[in-house]
Every structure is written in structure tokens, then in C-alpha cells.
Amino acid sequence: MRASPLLSLSIFITFVSIFSLLTYLPSFFAQISRIERQLEEELDEFLNIEHEFRKEFDIYPKNYERRQKKHVYSYCECEYINTCPPGRIGITGPDGQPGKDGLPGMPGSPGIPGELPNILYQQVFGCRICPYGPKGKSGYKGIDGPPGIPGWPGEPGVRGMNGERGSTGLDGAPGEPGSPGLPGFAGLPGSIGITGIKGVMGEVGEPGAPGIPGEEGLSGPTGQPGSPGSIGAMGYEGAYGDRGEPGPPGPIGRRGGPGLDSHYCPCPSRKMFLSILREKTKKQL
């Protein structure tokens, strides 16, 4: 019971952190593009300054006559340690135009402890190390190299947000009918229903043909006296049939409850009308 709140809290914190990370990515990429733009501007400014300096440097005439012709030998005449006195100071050039203020640079990361190469510890005999000359022109574009080795597969990306709910698809074709289920258990017996309203008295039907007298039945036990029925409407006088032999009175059964079709009133049968007519004729006689 205690693990459920902690689990829900951890899931909520995870979702919040992922959402904050996704919202920070646009500003992060915007900051990177801004830094690249600043670096490009500073590099263009530096190239412009270099171009102007080279133009001003080319204005002054080159005095080749003052140079003494050096003797060219098959070996280098310079020494590793130069003890020659420095030359006189040249003419001071004109002041350059003040440059534009540069953009503030990003703070650099602390460097690692440096190590002096082993080459500098070695004693060099022969020519001294001269400074590098001016930067040469860019060379021609070389031939495209062969394709590199395929890199390692990258790490899986962050899972994207859930997309919007799609529209409801079309109804599929109806499936095949399933196999018939097992027969259900028998239901509990229903409660006794409410006695229905007495229906409208139907029309008197045509008198039926006299029936064949039945065999004399066994004498049944004396039944309990039934409740008197309601007096029905006077019917049309029918033809007198042959009087049959009186049979022994049968037992009166108890009244049964309504069946399954208790709300459906079937039409009265012809035998019911004949029994009502016979009772009325007996009472009149």
C-alpha cells in the first residue's frame, strides 16, 4: 500500500524532468547558434583588419638596394645562437584606425597541466629555428577521399511526446458467428404475479355440435366449496342439446400462479364458453 504513492510520485517527477528538458532544448540550440554567429562576426572582423594591414604594408616601397647580396653555399651558415647586434629602429608607421569593440567572449575552461616536449630538451646543432613566414594562399581542392568507416550506432534518442488522438476509423467487417455457448443454469422460481384485470366479454360463439357422452368416471373425493363466481352477462339462448349422464363431481384443485406469459391474455377457448352455457342452463332448470 505504501509503494503506490511513491511510485506515482517518482513517475510524476520523471515526467516533469523530461518535459523541462524538452522545453530547454530550443533555448539551448538558440544559444549555440548565437555563439556561432558571434564567432563568425569576430572572425570576419579579424580578417578585415588583416586585409587592411596588408594593404597598408604594401604601400611602403621595398628597398632591395640596401640589402647586401649574401653568399650562397651548399650548407647553412646560420648558427643556433645568434650574437649579431640588432639593426636600427625603423620609421614609425602611421597610427591605424581604432577597431570596433569586440563581443565579450565566453569564459574558457581551465587547461590541463602542460608538459614540455622531449624535443626541446635535446641539444640542436646547426641552423637556428626561424619564425614562421606569412600565411600562404589556400591550395586547390584535393581529390575526395574514400568514404570513412561507418561509425558506432548512436545512443537512443529521448522518447517523443504522445501524439494527438486520431479520428475514429471505419467500422470493420462483421466477424464470424461464435460457437453456441453452454446451456445456462436454471433460474430461480419467479414470485407470484399480480392478478390481471378481467377482460371484456367476447361475443357468444355458434353452438357447437353435441359431444359424445364420456365414460363414467371414478368417484372422486369431495372437494372444498369454491368461492362463488361473478355473474356473467346474459347470453343468447342456444339450442338444447341432448342431456348427458351426470358424472360424479370431481375434486376442485387449488388456484395456480401465473405462468411465464402472465402479461399476455390469450383468447378464451370454445370449451370455456360451452362450460359457462351449461352452468347457466342448469341454474335455469
Swiss-Prot record:
Keywords: Collagen, Cuticle, Disulfide bond, Repeat. Residues 207-257 are annotated as: Disordered. Residues 207-231 have a biased composition (Low complexity). One of its GO terms (cellular component) is collagen trimer. InterPro entries: Col_cuticle_N (IPR002486), Collagen (IPR008160). Signal peptide: none annotated. The keyword Lipid metabolism does not apply. The keyword Disulfide bond applies. One of its GO terms (molecular function) is structural constituent of cuticle. Residues 87-116, 133-261 are annotated as: Triple-helical region. Collagen polypeptide chains are complexed within the cuticle by disulfide bonds and other types of covalent cross-links. Nematode cuticles are composed largely of collagen-like proteins. The cuticle functions both as an exoskeleton and as a barrier to protect the worm from its environment. Belongs to the cuticular collagen family. This is Putative cuticle collagen 75.
